[in-house]
Amino acid sequence: MTTQETVKNTRTLVGRVVSDQRSKTITVLVERRVKHELYGKIVARSRKYHAHDENNEYKLGDLVEIAEGRPISKTKAWVVTRLVEKARVV
């Protein structure tokens, strides 16, 4: 028999950190653009996800990539995979 490698397709999303108050957890706002069914206008839809941040290294305003994983807590099943863009200091 040959061994087959199973490839897991995990969902990944890119969003902005809107809260980093909790320990080892950040809140990420993910925006997507969809076409309105009836009127055809492009509208922005958004959703917030709680993501695991083991070392508390991501700060407010950072653009991060999150991946779906196993449930870590009641509301947290996403893990931060990488930093896309650091927050700009104004």
Swiss-Prot record:
<dbReference type="GO" id="GO:0003735">
    <property type="term" value="F:structural constituent of ribosome"/>
</dbReference>
<comment type="subunit">
    <text>Part of the 30S ribosomal subunit.</text>
</comment>
<comment type="function">
    <text>One of the primary rRNA binding proteins, it binds specifically to the 5'-end of 16S ribosomal RNA.</text>
</comment>
<dbReference type="GO" id="GO:0006412">
    <property type="term" value="P:translation"/>
</dbReference>
<dbReference type="InterPro" id="IPR012340">
    <property type="entry name" value="NA-bd_OB-fold"/>
</dbReference>
<keyword id="KW-0689">Ribosomal protein</keyword>
<keyword id="KW-0699">rRNA-binding</keyword>
<dbReference type="InterPro" id="IPR019979">
    <property type="entry name" value="Ribosomal_uS17_CS"/>
</dbReference>
<dbReference type="GO" id="GO:0019843">
    <property type="term" value="F:rRNA binding"/>
</dbReference>
<keyword id="KW-0687">Ribonucleoprotein</keyword>
<dbReference type="InterPro" id="IPR019984">
    <property type="entry name" value="Ribosomal_uS17_bact/chlr"/>
</dbReference>
<dbReference type="Pfam" id="PF00366">
    <property type="entry name" value="Ribosomal_S17"/>
</dbReference>
<keyword id="KW-0694">RNA-binding</keyword>
<dbReference type="InterPro" id="IPR000266">
    <property type="entry name" value="Ribosomal_uS17"/>
</dbReference>
<comment type="similarity">
    <text>Belongs to the universal ribosomal protein uS17 family.</text>
</comment>
<protein>
    <recommendedName>
        <fullName>Small ribosomal subunit protein uS17</fullName>
    </recommendedName>
</protein>
<dbReference type="GO" id="GO:0022627">
    <property type="term" value="C:cytosolic small ribosomal subunit"/>
</dbReference>
